[in-house]
Amino acid sequence: RRGSPQGGSHTTPHPDRLTPSPDDTYDDDTNHPNGRNNSIEIVPQLPPDRPLIELGVATLRKNFMEASCTVETNSGLAIFWKIGKPSVDAFNRGTTHTRLMRNGVPVYALVSTLRVPWLNVIPLTKITCAACPTNLVAGDGEDLNSCTTKSTTIPCPGQQRTHIFFSAKGHRAVCITSELVSQPTITWSVGSDRLRNDGFSQTWYGIQPGVCGILRSRFAFTAPPGALDQHQRTISVRSAHRTQRRAITKCYPTPTQLPTSL
């Protein structure tokens, strides 16, 4: 268990805890002007009941992961966060008190917000917000049976994107797809003609802090794929992924990009 639940910073480092960048000192919570605080925040006493809890994760200004945890409750609570197993002790957090309308009835709610630079977060890791009684100071490995928790998977920082580039002479094409949760299967086609798999190579870059997977596929045109006029020379890249719907991305080259002979 940790010591005092009143805030401040830990003096004993934890080997597997997330570590912030020394430059990340912003903070929107006026209660914590230094932008650093424990992952535990004590809130006032409110009526007893099992709180309702909602959790959302989004990207803020491209560089930050922002998680927001809303707890509807009238009881005294300690709110804390975990990313994976470690507690989130050193990143910018803030709690605000507000009232929400639920079925036309105003309810008391607490909103805890966590901001972490994406470079300190590995996408697809579980993030958890826990609302615990004030007499329980939860930490790493603490039993959370008496807490109300909500977990979700941290998404990729951005939406999946696919770009196709042509060489100056038009005899090579490169397809780069980013923000992938795992390596997909790629097929190339020109018009309605599917190209043989022995004509291209691909490189996979796995998930890293702040970045989901990237697949780079390169195709060299070694023979004409068929009698196609310039308006029909459309490159299609089809990526199939087990956990995502099938996505088809087409590239319509400008006249200066069109190969004279494929």
UniProtKB/Swiss-Prot annotation:
Membrane topology: Single-pass membrane protein
Pfam families (alphabetical): Herpes_gp2
InterPro entries: Varicellovirus_Gp2_glycop
GO biological process: viral process
One GO location term (cellular component): membrane
Keyword Transport attached: no
Disordered: region residues: 1-45
Record-annotated membrane-spanning stretches: none
Function text: Virulence factor.
Protein name: Glycoprotein gp2
Source organism (scientific name): Equine herpesvirus 1 (strain Kentucky D) (EHV-1)
